[in-house]
């Protein structure tokens, strides 16, 4: 007999070699009917898994979050089965679950069309309704290779050759379809009910541009109909808010082939950019930061010393000149250490908070570029805090408070924190890591945040915090970071004189609130759906005249607003007032100042706010004062 421990703390005895499904039947028929997979000693397994030792067991259903990835993996197999039935000449390759869905790569001469996707999806529903049994089989390696070659599945045969010899070759069979897979999978295709095929894209075999291009079908799958509908609605909203589309419509920026991954900022977009930079500059000055500027092009010898050349060489732009190799900096940290090293530093100089809006370049693959979200040329609100070990907690608390304040000003209040602790391969002693991790945990808690743990995901040189924002349609964006570094000060020989007179290495805290300004602006465009708040809007007030005889007064109003630092647009053309208002509304200007005969006589304007029908009559002084207060962030 074996002892099975259940989540409620109970322990029951069963005969050896009983399956997880058979145990589910003993517990209740309803559980057995809903059961998808088993968690045995923390590992996810098929329900058909035989248990011959004492263990901890959870029977999981679609209600359990662990099953969502299984549902998506099952949907990938269902997609492949449908494709093979409809297009038998197609070769299947790989089909993993990914965030919010899955994909499956196919080798086929003729491209899949949108109509093909609809047919494939219909076939998937048909196969799911058949509720085909899914079974796991272990095969001899040579037999598996020969089998896949015999049915023309040469990619599968190649995959088997790359599987370590000590790993079993497991296949899953459903209906007439058989696929190479580690699993686990649900016991039948009927568990995959709520899915949709999304698009087709090209993908290199094994992600290598030297290999052939495959066709990748993307799909999404969820545990419930409501979850699927919610996700599709979110995608619909995201499409409406796409910063690339709005960037063009609102005349903010553009990209072109001659400078891939580099932004052409138009005047309105550059206004938003500069407003954000000036806002951050005011915040960090109030918080005791100095601002510096370091070279964009630096000799590779510094990058070799810092370790970046070894780790990031492929992502750096380099050029040869005067028998030297120079590289465009991908980050600012080594240059900041050079400034720290100028002159003798004392413990009295610490903490030293050094910031820079540093222009960085990263050689991102062209296929990874995505509007403002992924670029090759970027500016970060980057800063490095050089401090003593005993100052880590206070500096982290201070940073968390600043970050919270900044995010709130931009309208983000749902902030999640991820804490990444020591990886297996790391620099520094266990004692140093203990101190660092405890200091960060204490600081996060003092700042009023809870956190989720990412075990082993810290960098080799120190633990880190990641700050994740949730936007208006529920998407999450990782923006802020705080990274502790014991290694770079050592590598670049940075030191300070302690109170005892001995030389010590400072701890270096790499920190950013927005991250890349380009990416953060992309996030803001989508968060606001292009409707920037008044203080951030590229045009804060648009002036529109009802008749041409009011133009002189309109120009007076424009002059007064500009002299007060207000960003203004004006339309004094003969066009009808409704047309002018509609045009400014389409440009998402937050305030439209309408000028008629009465407004001119009273030295006033009638304000219409974007998205409302309400109107408010203000004097020019009142309007300027209101905007001044909004701009004071």
From Swiss-Prot:
Sequence segments annotated as region (Catalytic): 242-533
GO cellular component, one term: cytoplasm
Binding, Zn(2+): 333, 384, 510
Chief site of localization: cytoplasm
Keyword ATP-binding assigned: yes
Catalytic activity: tRNA(Thr) + L-threonine + ATP = L-threonyl-tRNA(Thr) + AMP + diphosphate + H(+)
Cofactor(s) recorded in Swiss-Prot or TrEMBL: Zn(2+)
E.C. code: 6.1.1.3
Cofactor note (record): Binds 1 zinc ion per subunit.
CDD domains the UniProt entry points to: TGS_ThrRS, ThrRS_anticodon, ThrRS_core
Pfam families linked to this entry: HGTP_anticodon, TGS, tRNA-synt_2b, tRNA_SAD
GO molecular function, one term: tRNA binding
Subcellular location: Cytoplasm
Domain TGS: 1-61
Functional description taken from the UniProt entry: Catalyzes the attachment of threonine to tRNA(Thr) in a two-step reaction: L-threonine is first activated by ATP to form Thr-AMP and then transferred to the acceptor end of tRNA(Thr). Also edits incorrectly charged L-seryl-tRNA(Thr).
Assembly and interaction partners: Homodimer.
Family: Belongs to the class-II aminoacyl-tRNA synthetase family.
Name of the protein described by the UniProt record: Threonine--tRNA ligase
Natural source organism: Rickettsia bellii (strain OSU 85-389)
Gene: thrS
């Amino acid at each position: 007999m074996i002892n099975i421990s259940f989540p409620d703390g109970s322990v029951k005895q069963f005969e050896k070699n009983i399956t997880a499904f058979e145990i589910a039947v003993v517990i209740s028929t309803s559980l057995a009917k809903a059961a998808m997979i088993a968690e045995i000693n923390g590992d996810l397994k098929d329900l058909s898994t035989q248990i011959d030792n004492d263990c901890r067991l959870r029977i999981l259903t679609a209600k359990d979050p662990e099953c969502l990835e299984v549902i998506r993996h099952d949907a990938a197999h269902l997609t492949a089965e449908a494709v093979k039935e409809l297009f038998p000449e197609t070769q299947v390759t790989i089909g993993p679950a990914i965030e919010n869905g899955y994909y499956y790569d196919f080798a086929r001469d003729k491209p899949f069309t949108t109509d093909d996707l609809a047919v494939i999806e219909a076939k998937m529903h048909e196969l799911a309704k058949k509720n085909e049994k899914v079974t796991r089989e272990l095969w001899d390696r040579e037999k598996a290779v020969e089998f896949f070659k015999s049915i023309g599945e040469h990619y599968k045969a190649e995959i088997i050759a790359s599987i370590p010899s000590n790993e079993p070759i497991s296949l899953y069979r459903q209906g007439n379809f058989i696929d190479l897979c580690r699993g686990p999978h649900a016991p039948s295709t009927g568990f995959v009910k709520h899915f949709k095929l999304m698009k087709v894209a090209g993908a290199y075999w094994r992600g290598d541009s030297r290999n052939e291009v495959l066709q990748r079908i993307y799909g999404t799958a969820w545990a419930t109909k409501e979850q699927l509908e919610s996700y599709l609605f979110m995608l619909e909203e995201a499409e409406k808010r796409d910063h690339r589309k709005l960037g063009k419509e609102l005349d903010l920026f553009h990209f072109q082939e001659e400078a891939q991954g580099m932004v052409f900022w138009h005047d309105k977009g550059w206004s938003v950019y500069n407003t954000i930079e000036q806002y951050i500059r005011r915040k960090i000055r109030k918080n005791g930061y100095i601002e510096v500027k370091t070279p964009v092009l630096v000799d590779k010898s510094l990058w070799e010393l810092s370790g970046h050349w070894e780790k990031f060489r492929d992502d750096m732009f380099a050029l040869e000149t005067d028998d030297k190799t120079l590289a465009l900096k991908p980050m600012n940290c080594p240059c900041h250490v050079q400034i720290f090293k100028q002159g003798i530093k004392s413990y009295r100089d610490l903490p030293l908070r050094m910031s820079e809006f540093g222009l960085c370049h990263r050689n991102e693959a062209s296929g990874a570029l995505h509007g403002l979200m992924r670029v090759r040329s970027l500016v970060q609100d980057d800063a490095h805090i050089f401090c003593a070990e005993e100052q880590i907690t206070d500096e982290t608390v201070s940073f968390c408070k600043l970050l919270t304040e900044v995010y709130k000003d931009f309208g983000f209040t749902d902030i999640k924190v991820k804490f990444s602790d020591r990886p297996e391969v790391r620099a520094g002693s266990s004692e140093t890591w203990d101190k660092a991790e405890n200091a960060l945990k204490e600081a996060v808690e003092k700042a009023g945040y809870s956190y989720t743990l990412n075990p082993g995901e810290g960098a080799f040189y120190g633990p880190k915090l990641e700050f994740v924002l949730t936007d208006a349609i529920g998407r999450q964006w990782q923006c802020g970071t705080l990274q502790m570094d014991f290694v770079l000060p050592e590598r670049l020989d940075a030191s300070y004189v302690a109170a005892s007179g001995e030389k010590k290495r400072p701890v270096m805290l790499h920190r950013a609130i927005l991250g890349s300004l380009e990416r953060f602006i992309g996030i803001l465009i989508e968060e606001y759906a292009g409707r920037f708040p008044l203080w951030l809007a590229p045009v804060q007030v648009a002036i529109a005249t009802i008749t041409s005889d009011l133009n002189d007064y309109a120009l007076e109003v424009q002059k007064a607003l500009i002299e007060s630092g207000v960003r203004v647009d004006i339309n004094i053309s003969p066009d009808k007032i409704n047309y002018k208002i509609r045009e400014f509304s389409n440009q998402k200007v937050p305030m439209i100042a309408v000028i008629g005969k009465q407004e001119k006589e009273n030295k006033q304007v009638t304000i219409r706010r974007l998205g409302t029908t309400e109107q408010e009559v203000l004097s020019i002084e009142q309007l300027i004062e209101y905007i001044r207060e909004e701009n004071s962030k």
